[in-house]
C-alpha cells in the first residue's frame, strides 16, 4: 500500500503512527514534495464513489484564500482536477492507495487502518 500525506499534518502523523504500531508495510509520498498530477487525481476519483469535493482540503489556507468554496460549483470536473493538480496542499490527506486498487481519502484512511 502507498500513503500520500504531508509530513506536518497531524492527521497524517497519527495515521502513520497507527500503521507503524500495527507493523503495516507501506510506501510514503509527501504531497508537498511530489504534487499529484491531474491524471492521478482523475484516476483516484474514478476509483471511488466520493464526490470530487471530497478530494479538496477545505480547511487549508489555499482553499480559503482562493475562495474555492464559492467557485467549485461553477467549475467543470476537468477544471477541478486541474485545480487540485496545481498544489498538493489543496488536496485532502491522507490518501491511501491499496494494493487491490481501492482508494481512501481523509478520515476514511484512519478508520480503515484502525480496523486492520
Language-model features: locations:
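Local sequence-structure signature of Cys/Sec-based thiol-disulfide redox active-site neighborhoods
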Residues: 1-21, 26-31
